[in-house]
Amino acid sequence: MAKIHVVMNRKGGVGKSLISLNMGAVCADVRGTRPDGQPYVAVASADPQGTALWRAARLAVQPFDILDIADDIENIALMKQLPYAHIFVDTPGWAEINPETGLDPLGEDKYGRILRALLDQADDVIVPVITEVDCYEPTWQTIEWVLKPLGVPFQVVINNWPPAEGIAYVDGTRGWCEDHGYPVAQTVIRRYRVHTNATRVVTQYNNNRVELQAREDFYRFALEHGLRGAETRLPVQAGTDTEAVEA
């Protein structure tokens, strides 16, 4: 039975596609292939923009299978039955809908239904956050309005940090997560041009200093994600965090 790892944040531009593809690549590298030579790992795209599909198409060699599920809501319930050990799912952002209005915070359109179907299947959710204060509120909404009410285990990861800007931005973002009681990875995924060039996944990077460092971030996060395990992430809490999001 496949383990489903959903990469989700209401905010766009936080690196969901990057993380989905590279976590899939690392997992495929470590897991190897089945006796028939097929991969144990797939990356699925539920994003209508198709960023993960575009990036995967640019790879000379795909170490995983790539699945387009953006128009396939009927079969999402069957994903665990697919012949993979792990499936990493790239998801779209969505518009702000306050549940206090009585509406579903994911919305009622096709993609809201797809996100709900994915969360029904998810073993865990990876929530990328960047070190910018305008990312805090959508991250809070993703966790408080969606993940915690559904009881889905999750882990926040700080992504796309430019080291030249200083560690204070990481410390501030980590502190915000910890103040809200959100489990946040010790690994920080740094920003590198080799990531944004989108012609290779980290398992295909060269053995020079910069590309080794870029690759290391994802191997470290994959190890940390696996060691924590879905059952050890945030326990379901009664109620939600109602404090205003502070910059």
State each model region's role.
Residues 94-98, 102, 106-108, 119-139, ...:
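Conserved Switch II/interswitch segment of TRAFAC-class P-loop GTPases
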